[in-house]
A protein has these predicted regions:
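Long, low-complexity, compositionally biased intrinsically disordered regions
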Residues: 1-90
Length: 90
């Protein structure tokens, strides 16, 4: 899993996302089919959505300024850590 995530995120976003997850900043994680939504508490509360496709993440969105510029952010990484820590049918 780590090698896969290293292709999705830069190391700083991955490390910060892991820290957000470990500090319990991922809240209201929900699954509807292959779509996940969550709120991540950062400098503000950011909405994160991701679509899971067979064996990979299809698309990810976040309301933070960094993601709005087309980047994959620490909030997205935090949600992936949260998903991987739970038993979801994907």
């Amino acid at each position: 899993m780590a090698a896969f995530w290293n292709r999705l995120f830069d190391i700083q976003s991955l490390e910060h996302g892991r820290n957000y997850f470990l500090r319990g900043q991922v809240q209201n994680l929900r699954q509807e089919g292959m779509r996940f939504t969550a709120e991540v508490q950062g400098t503000a509360t950011y909405q994160v959505e991701l679509e899971w496709e067979p064996d990979c993440v299809g698309s990810m969105t976040c309301g933070c300024p960094y993601a709005q510029r087309g980047n994959r952010c620490k909030h997205m990484a935090a949600v992936l850590f949260a998903i991987s820590s739970r038993s979801f049918a994907i």
